[in-house]
């Protein structure tokens, strides 16, 4: 009868089959990993020991298969980014820096705020009056007669 695999055995097997590399970190601050041959497995399987390493938010990492299958990157072929390859944005032109006004704003448009507010109030009062005149009046009881008056 086969014994069930413990979680510790699974963790060791997983460490022996995979190693991770950082893609976004410059080489100066990249987390160095030590690669050592596994004592429990033969045929050159390697595993990564990470001392005090942690995942930095905003950086992606990838894993490559190691061991029995072909691996995408060996420990010596891990791609590294140098600090000199950063692309710096072009500087803004002095013309763009001196533009304080919104280009969509009409410079010749002059509004009278008080007049606009009065027009708005007249329209809203007309709307309010028309809504109040057209709604039904509540009846006192079910047997009350419906008023016959129409607004004039």
Curated annotation (Swiss-Prot):
Pfam families: Trnau1ap
Domain of life the protein comes from: Eukaryota
Descriptive protein name: Putative uncharacterized protein C6orf52
Organism: Homo sapiens
């Amino acid at each position: 009868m086969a014994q069930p695999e413990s979680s510790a055995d699974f963790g060791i097997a997983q460490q022996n089959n995979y190693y991770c590399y950082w893609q976004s970190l410059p080489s100066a601050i990249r987390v160095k990993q030590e690669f050592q041959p596994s004592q429990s497995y033969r045929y050159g399987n390697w595993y990564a020991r990470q001392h005090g390493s942690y995942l930095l938010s905003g950086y992606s990492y990838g894993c490559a298969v190691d061991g029995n299958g072909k691996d995408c990157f060996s420990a010596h072929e891990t791609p590294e980014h140098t600090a000199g390859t950063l692309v710096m944005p072009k500087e803004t032109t002095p013309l763009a820096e001196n533009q304080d006004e919104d280009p969509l704003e009409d410079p010749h448009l002059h509004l009278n705020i008080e007049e606009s507010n009065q027009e708005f109030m007249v329209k809203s009062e007309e709307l309010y009056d028309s809504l109040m005149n057209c709604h039904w009046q509540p009846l006192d009881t079910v047997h009350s007669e419906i008023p016959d008056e129409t607004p004039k």
